[in-house]
C-alpha cells in the first residue's frame, strides 16, 4: 500500500526556519506509523529524529501531531488512512522543538511535579501495607493509566494561549486527581491549596480537547471537574 509521510523538519543547529520533507514508501495496512518512521530512518534518511521506546502504547514516548490531531505514532495503523494519502506528522504543539519531531518536555514535567505526584501519608506505616478496598481504588482507576505522553496538554487551547501559559495542564491535574481521591493519601488540604487557583484546576475551561485525544481513554475533563467539586466541598466545611 503506497503512502507518503510529510514530516516537519527542524535542526536548530543548521536550520533558520522549519520546513517539511516528504517520504514515499510502501507499507502493509497493519504497519504502524512508528514502523514507517523507523523504515524511513533506516532506509531513506538517518537524520530524521523522533522519540520512541516500547512501541506498544505504554511508554508515551512517540506522541506527535498526526494530520492535525495529537496521538501516538505506535497506535495509528496505515489502514486508518486512505491509500496514497499524504500523512502529515508534526511535533506536539505548545512545546519547544529540540529537533524534528522531538520536543522539550522540561516545563511539562516541571508543572507535573509541582502538584506533588506521589502518595503523602503522614501516619506511621502499618506493618504490612496501606490497604484499600477495591471500590476505593476504582474511584481513580482510570487516572492510573496516564503515560505522560503530553497529548492532552498539547491539545489544550488553554495551554496554547500565551495569556494562560502558566496553567498547570490536564496531565498534571489527572495525576492530582489520582492522589486527591486516594483513600490512603493524607494531604487533602495541602493538595487543594496547590490546585485552588486560576493556573490550577480553575484554569480548565472544560473544552474536552484533552479527553478526545487521550490514547488511554482517560475521562480527563470529567476528572478535572471532580477536582473542582472537591475544592467546593472543602471550602464548605
Model-flagged regions — what are they?
Residues 45-51:
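Active-site phosphate-binding and catalytic loops of NTP-dependent enzymes
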Residues 2-22:
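Eukaryote-biased recognition of intrinsically disordered, low-complexity regulatory segments
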Residues 81-86:
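Extracellular interaction modules
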Residues 20-32:
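Short, contiguous acidic and Ser/Thr-rich linear segments
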Residues 54-63:
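Short, structured protein-protein interaction patches enriched in aromatics and acidic/basic residues
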Residues 26, 66-68:
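Short strand-turn-strand beta-turns centered on an Asx-Gly dipeptide
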Residues 30-43, 90-237:
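Ferredoxin-type iron-sulfur electron-transfer modules in oxidoreductases and energy-metabolism complexes
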Amino acid at each position: 500500500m503506497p503512502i507518503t509521510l510529510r514530516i516537519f523538519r527542524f535542526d536548530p543547529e543548521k536550520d533558520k526556519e522549519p520546513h517539511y520533507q516528504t517520504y514515499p514508501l510502501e507499507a502493509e495496512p497493519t504497519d504502524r506509523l512508528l514502523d514507517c518512521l523507523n523504515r524511513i530512518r533506516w532506509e531513506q534518511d538517518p537524520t530524521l529524529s523522533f522519540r520512541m521506546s516500547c512501541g506498544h502504547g505504554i511508554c508515551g514516548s512517540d506522541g506527535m501531531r498526526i494530520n492535525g490531531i495529537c496521538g501516538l505514532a505506535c497506535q495509528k495503523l496505515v489502514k486508518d488512512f486512505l491509500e496514497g494519502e499524504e500523512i502529515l506528522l508534526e511535533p506536539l504543539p505548545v512545546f519547544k522543538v529540540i529537533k524534528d519531531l522531538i520536543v522539550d518536555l522540561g516545563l511539562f514535567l516541571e508543572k507535573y511535579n509541582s502538584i506533588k505526584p506521589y502518595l503523602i501519608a503522614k501516619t506511621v506505616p502499618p506493618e504490612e501495607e496501606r490497604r484499600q478496598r477495591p471500590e476505593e481504588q476504582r474511584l481513580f482507576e482510570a487516572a492510573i493509566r496516564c503515560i505522560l505522553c503530553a497529548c492532552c496538554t498539547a491539545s489544550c487551547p488553554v495551554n496554547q494561549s500565551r495569556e494562560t501559559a502558566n496553567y498547570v495542564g490536564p496531565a498534571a491535574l489527572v495525576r492530582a486527581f489520582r492522589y486527591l481521591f486516594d483513600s490512603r493519601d493524607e494531604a487533602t488540604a495541602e493538595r487543594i491549596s496547590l490546585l485552588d487557583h486560576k493556573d490550577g484546576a480553575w484554569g480548565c475551561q472544560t473544552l474536552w480537547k484533552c479527553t478526545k485525544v487521550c490514547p488511554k481513554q482517560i475521562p480527563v475533563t470529567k476528572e478535572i471537574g471532580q477536582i473542582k467539586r472537591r475544592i467546593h466541598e472543602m471550602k464548605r466545611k
